[in-house]
Amino acid sequence: MPEPARPATASVPVEGTLLAFDYGEKRIGVALGNTVSRSARALETIPNRSVDFRFAQISRLVGEWQPVGFVVGMPVHPDGEEQPMIKLAKRFGNQLLGRYGLPVTWVDERYSSIAAQDAGASDDVLDAEAARIILQQFFDEHA
């Protein structure tokens, strides 16, 4: 049985802004939320063109929103098995930690994209809406 995904750091921010990511090979959905209000909103979708482009966009968001931590969706299969994308999502989370030195927490995202589609999200905001669902799940689990 695979080991469950663990956060890159053990500390979960108590108060402040969080950025959440639905990592994909083509696009990265981004959501924003606050630990005090415990509410999340879809922010934007970043084309995953290259490492440099990806982190230039994320650095812009970090500068603008000054987050105290990150939440990254982990693509676990419905039966609990790890999907091939999980290695890429873990690497992405570790890159966030290395670049920004902020805590990273992973959340099981197995149905976030389906939930975003069911909520009627259009293709251009689907990934950002999935990130919002991931972040809201984080808030709900840490209430």
UniProtKB/Swiss-Prot annotation:
It holds the Pfam family RuvX. Its EC number is 3.1.-.-. It is found in: Cytoplasm. One of its GO terms (molecular function) is nuclease activity. Keywords: Cytoplasm, Hydrolase, Nuclease, Ribosome biogenesis. Its main location: cytoplasm. It comes from the Bacteria. InterPro entries: RNaseH-like_sf (IPR012337), YqgF (IPR005227), YqgF/RNaseH-like_dom (IPR006641), YqgF/RNaseH-like_dom_sf (IPR037027). One of its GO terms (biological process) is rRNA 5'-end processing. One of its GO terms (cellular component) is cytosol. CDD domains: YqgF. Could be a nuclease involved in processing of the 5'-end of pre-16S rRNA. PANTHER family: POLYNUCLEOTIDYL TRANSFERASE, RIBONUCLEASE H-LIKE SUPERFAMILY PROTEIN. Belongs to the YqgF nuclease family. This is Putative pre-16S rRNA nuclease.
